[in-house]
Amino acid sequence: MKNILLTALISAGCLSAYAQSKPGKEDDYYRIITMPIPETIKMEVGGLAVLPDGRLAASTRRGEVWMIGNPYLKGDGKPSFQRFASGLHEPLGLLSRGKDFLISQRGEVTRLEDTNNDGVADVYDSFARWPLSGNYHQYSYGPVAMPNGELLVTLNLDWVGRGASQSKWRGWMLKLGEDGKLTPYATGLRSPSGFGSYKGDIFYTENQGDWVGSGRMTHLEKGDFAGNPAGLRWSKEEGSPVKLTPQDVPNTGEPLYDVAKKVPGIKPPAVWFPHTIVGISTSDFKEDVTNGAFGPFAGQVFVGDQGHSIITRVDFEKVNGVWQGTVFPFREGFMSGIIRMVWGLDGSMFVGQTSRGWSATGKADFGIQRLVWTGKMPFEMKNVHSMPDGFEIVFTSPVDKKSAADQDAYKLNSFTYKYHQTYGSPIINTQEVPLKGIVVSEDGLRVRLVVDPAVLRKGYIHEIKAEGVKSPDGNPLLHTTGYYTLNEIASGTPVSASQFTTTVKASAPDHSMHTMPAEASNTAPSAKRVIEMPKDWTNGPDQVVTIGTVPGLKFDISSIQVKAGSRIKIIFNNNDDMLHNLVITKPGTANAVGEAGLNLGLKGSELSYVPRTNDVLFHSNIVEPEKSEAIYFVAPKQPGAYQYVCTFPGHYTLMQGKLNVVK
């Protein structure tokens, strides 16, 4: 803690600095330092713990625990590694208790202790146990200690083409007593790899899947049901605080917030993470308790994303007793999939990563990196607050008042997701949120965006773009968009028109509800997506190809050869447990097409993440897990090395193949 305070004092002068004289990059403010790891160690991190003596403990999916000396890379810059434990079953957590460790394996929490001080665990005690089905998807997480000393574990659902709870308490959060007793706390969880405390309350992160339209972060209280009904199989068991049964959960496709108003016990999320826009698989999170050593976001939450290899930032607030808030992009460019994060003794952040079987945009199989604030002040939206008539943005440093008062500097939309059994959801009910007025504070640190209260929708994600806001030096925000989940609207006195810095010319708000069924949301007819055999193919296709997937974000066929001008039928069989598509592109354009799909924003799901470009020749729809789709096309007449790629965001860099067209 002394080191943290010292760092904060040294950096105090930087906190008042304005944005840099040239447009900033993330690396200017938060530097990623990669820890060198010996080639003989497969450091597929499942858990991290910082020890008081400065060492870093890491559990790995290979069943080992390593003690890492000099993790801050001081002196000669070389860390040391000593294996502390081995033979564990894919541990995905690690808790240091001083004299021992608690670690979750697939089927138990194990207590590890070194009683003879030789640096190697000689005690492996079974601390708490639960049954297993043998399903590959039965991951177990924790334990995590709460500020009051209570311990928590979470148990992942099975995957059988859908989420299932094939053994007791799968899909639940459980409290773990000092005697090893497990007490059920809440259910509705699907893949709860990230959980812990924020301001003393319990939160957990969730990944898109069945019954989960997009990633989210939920405040869990005893007896809550967070959405996936598989775990309700055990709600009648002794000790269950949950009263709902699977039959109580409607599969109507209405938004989760609306369903929760009708079915007591369902808990809507505090914050949604719009899928593919701010990640695809939320993982660990950490509240910033560094007292400024990590920059200007003390008290906020940083959330890892395994699939996109990024960290996002969440600014929470409690309105009418309900947690809600904004998620912002924060830092991209990590080497692998982020699964664990922990604060170092100096206020930097250790980031443990792995991608085997799960895949990630970071191309390394695993790694440990450290994220360090450089002391420079990023020009960012620091907070967004709910107001009775809109939102107030607080910036990290003063804005250029002229640009901040320009009505064209902002664009607001709201949208949500379906709550249904289908895997994921398209964005639905998109609606523009027109501005009425703008109020820029005298000190330039706050901007109030005033709207007609009638267009604010509870339970909806409100996209707040501030692309036109500049610093006094003329630089844009480092990240220009935030996504505010509006569960409650703050009370207070609305701003009067006489207080506006800018009065926005009135226009009729678009109240249209662009609701699209999940099955039809991205199935618009297209000559590039033909899913019925053309009638003039009287003799059928000349060639039929069936292509599937293998673990690691790969197609199971890396190369296909077809004759120029031939009639082709490709059956894409998605035998994976995540969403994919199949897009055939011109030679050498797969990466560009994939990047364009990534940048589609709110329109991505509607377009099946297939950008409208001449580089796309043919494509499938987004295909759900365990489903398939056939497409028909005539092969190009020009021979060449064409490509096929999955353009679902985060997949395109790895999931590619060659379509060789020959004479």
Language-model region placement:
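Acidic, Ser/Thr/Gly/Pro-rich low-complexity segments and short DxT(G/T)-type signature motifs
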Residues: G375-E380, D400, A466-S521, P525-S526
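Short, surface-exposed alpha-helix to beta-strand junction/turn motifs within ectodomains of secreted
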Residues: V394-G437, I464-K470, T480-Y484, I584
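N-terminal edge beta-strand
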Residues: G375-K376, W537-R567
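Beta-propeller domains with acidic blade repeats across secreted/periplasmic ectodomains
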Residues: Q20-P378
